[in-house]
From Swiss-Prot:
Secreted keyword on record: no
Organism field: Drosophila pseudoobscura pseudoobscura
Catalyses which reaction(s): 5-(methylsulfanyl)-alpha-D-ribose 1-phosphate = 5-(methylsulfanyl)-D-ribulose 1-phosphate
Gene Ontology terms: biological process: L-methionine salvage from methylthioadenosine
Keyword Cytoplasm in annotation: yes
The protein's enzyme class: isomerase
Domain of life: Eukaryota
Pathway: Amino-acid biosynthesis; L-methionine biosynthesis via salvage pathway; L-methionine from S-methyl-5-thio-alpha-D-ribose 1-phosphate: step 1/6
UniProt cross-references to InterPro entries, sorted A to Z: IF-2B-related, IF-M1Pi, IF_2B-like_C, Initiation_fac_2B_a/b/d, M1Pi_N, NagB/RpiA_transferase-like
Marked site (Transition state stabilizer) residue numbers: C172
Protein name according to UniProt: Methylthioribose-1-phosphate isomerase
UniProt cross-references to HAMAP family, sorted A to Z: Salvage_MtnA
Length: 362
């Protein structure tokens, strides 16, 4: 059974504190928007899909017991809280898109004379809860599309009708801990395993926050997948020596041209994969694709505190007085990406804007 990082019933939300993993499994109550902002900003919950889900559900928990005098006052409350949640980690586009979707719903309901304030609140709660269910369904679809694409490429390269079990590499954490469940890039790995087509999965440590070593490795051991942890600096040697069939990573934001912002270190893995002729896939729901941003040059990159580089827990590991540069993400150019795996299929970066626009119109 997959790990459960988010526990929700109407009026109650708990998240698995990912800063304590893998040593301790502890759930934290999220009693409202302020708690939601803090757990997102402190990275106690992380992963673009999970950030959006937890942010929206924290608002649902906050307004659940409240009574509002008018639809206008409810709408104003929702707008202010949603904008605040978006500010917790601005690089991850999913929270912004979810906020825009919910605010659009609130605006429509405010204008609808057939809906009173109680019904408006109910409709809003229903919409936030539907996002939780949809994320899990979308992740399963991403897994199916991604596994199929990888196996087809491997079979074609071998001139065989069917691919055998494959070895894959992933970076950061994109599984049940980063989503509502199942995972994006790790969902592809999960689907390969379910098909009996996973020979081995390699995961990077993902410095400086060690999401790969702490979280992905934790999930892989939990699932009993054949898995090996490697240092970030070993990727070139790994691709040269271990016959890796594909790299599959997640995304925090994908620009209209296919440029992809993901956890720091993704860009260099893509460069190395290109050199070795290893297909490089990005797995992300449509909510991670921002067609309003023409290229990766326009993506705001969050910078994290020096302490995340200089300390492990309370122990300093870097020389006192050294300066640090600690961007949380980098941008992988579309030219290095083989395909972008979504819940609606796998798309080449050059076709992304046109294809997604058509999908959203249907």
């Amino acid at each position: 059974m997959s790990l459960q990082s988010i526990k929700y019933t109407r009026g109650s939300l708990e998240i698995l504190d990912q800063l304590l993993l893998p040593v301790q499994s502890k759930y934290l109550p999220v009693r409202g928007v302020e708690d939601g902002w803090k757990v997102i900003n402190k990275m106690q919950v992380r992963g673009a899909p999970a950030i959006a889900i937890v942010g929206c559900l924290s608002l649902a928990v906050e307004i659940h017991p409240e009574e509002f005098d008018s639809k206008k006052s409810l709408r104003q409350e929702l707008e202010g809280k949603l904008n605040y949640l978006v500010s917790a980690r601005p690089t991850a586009v999913n929270m912004k898109m979810a906020a825009d979707e919910l605010l659009s719903l609130a605006n429509d309901l405010t204008k609808d004379d057939n809906v009173d304030v109680a019904a408006m609140k109910q409709r809003f709660l229903n919409a936030t809860e539907a996002m939780l269910k949809k994320d899990i369904a979308d992740n399963r679809a991403i897994g199916a599309h991604g596994a199929k694409a990888i196996l087809q490429l491997v079979a074609a390269a071998a001139g065989a009708p069917m691919a055998g079990p494959v070895r894959v590499l992933t970076h950061c954490n994109t599984g049940s801990l980063a989503t509502a469940g199942y995972g994006t890039a790790l969902g592809v790995v999960r689907q390969l395993s379910e098909l009996g087509k996973l020979e081995h999965v390699y995961c990077t440590e993902t410095r400086p926050y060690n999401q790969g070593a702490r979280l992905t490795a934790y999930e892989l051991v939990h699932e009993k997948f054949p898995a090996t942890l490697v240092l970030d600096s070993m990727v070139a040697a790994l691709l040269r020596a271990k016959n890796v069939a594909a790299v599959v990573v997640g995304a925090d934001r994908v620009a209209a041209n296919g440029d992809t912002a993901n956890k720091i270190g993704t860009y260099q893995i893509a460069v190395v994969a290109k050199h070795h002729g290893v297909p490089f896939f990005v797995a992300a729901p449509l909510t991670s694709i921002d067609l309003h941003i023409p290229s990766g040059d326009h993506i705001i990159i969050e910078e994290r505190p020096d302490r995340e580089m200089t300390h492990v827990g309370e122990h300093r590991i870097a020389a006192p007085g050294i300066n640090c540069w600690n961007p949380a993400f980098d941008v992988t150019p579309a030219s290095l990406i083989t395909g972008i795996i979504t819940e609606r299929g796998v798309f080449q970066p050059a076709q992304l804007k046109e294809t997604i626009t058509k999908l959203l119109e249907t």
